Amino acid sequence: ATRSYGNGVYCNNSKCWNVGEAKENIAGIVISGKASGL
């Protein structure tokens, strides 16, 4: 599960990220994840 700490930081079981700083990185991870899954 993903947890929000209310200040733009989210954590899941493996890592934490700052949404404001990482939106583009998350999009890139999702895209590359889909590409590697093909």
From Swiss-Prot:
Keywords: Antibiotic, Antimicrobial, Bacteriocin, Disulfide bond, Secreted. GO terms for cellular component: extracellular region. Thermostable, retains activity after heating at 60, 80 and 100 degrees Celsius for 1 hour. Long-term storage at 4 degrees Celsius or -20 degrees Celsius does not affect activity. The keyword Secreted applies. Gene3D superfamilies: 1.20.5.130. Stable at pH 5.0. It comes from the Bacteria. The keyword Secreted applies. GO terms for biological process: defense response to Gram-negative bacterium; defense response to Gram-positive bacterium; killing of cells of another organism. InterPro entries: Bacteriocin_IIa, Bacteriocin_IIa_CS, Bacteriocin_IIa_dom_sf. It is found in: Secreted. Disulfide bonds join C11-C16. Belongs to the bacteriocin class IIA/YGNGV family. Bacteriocin that inhibits the growth of closely related Enterococcus species and a wide range of Gram-positive bacterial species. Inhibits the growth of several strains of the Gram-negative bacterium E.coli, but not the growth of Gram-negative Pseudomonas species. This is Bacteriocin enterocin-M. It comes from Enterococcus faecium (Streptococcus faecium).
